[in-house]
């Protein structure tokens, strides 16, 4: 099994939107988009398989594809209400509001960010269509005389989706090149439905 890794240096503006509906072979609709926080690092790992068909002692055909996608997102900080929304925690009360970390699976979300394109000097915006986040570990440390930065890191696992475009093919993310960071952020806002404050559909 082959593994493809990607580490991003020069990135930011992580946005998230809850998956409202997904119709296999047609479209996916997002709702309640928001900016997750300030990003430090993003990484993903795409697991691919390759099967060779032999005949007459030679390779006659090769079939390859992506089996799964996973990654991490390190943030400088994240507000508790946004973390609860991302992970699907329930809540009660108002002042103070109590968030209950339950054993339920986190909701499916679409999410994206921009990264610096060193080759062109511009930016590439990436949108992952359908994924689930988890917080598998956390470290809390007392204050000391020296400054020690401790950033929260979230794990995620993505799934392949089948939409009307590209027809008959599975896709897990889109990437678009832009000349400016502002243009990349504007595209991410549209994907997450942040600009109009409502839902957005991709087909």
Q: What are the residue ranges of the model-derived segments?
A:
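Polar/acidic, low-complexity leader/linker segments enriched in S/T/G and N/D
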Residues: 1-43, 199-203
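Short, solvent-exposed beta-alpha or beta-beta edge segments that form flexible loop/patches at the rim
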Residues: 47-62, 140-142
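Surface-exposed ligand/attachment interfaces on beta-rich extracellular proteins
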Residues: 53, 57-59, 95-97, 199-202
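Oligomerization/assembly interface segments of phage tail-like spikes and tubes
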Residues: 59-83, 147-161
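Beta-strand elements of well-folded, non-transmembrane domains
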Residues: 75-79, 115-119, 132-135, 158-162
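Charged, amphipathic alpha-helical segments
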Residues: 78-102
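Short helix-loop boundary/capping segments
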Residues: 100-136, 141
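Mixed-charge, glycine-accented linear interaction segment located at domain edges/termini
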Residues: 131-203
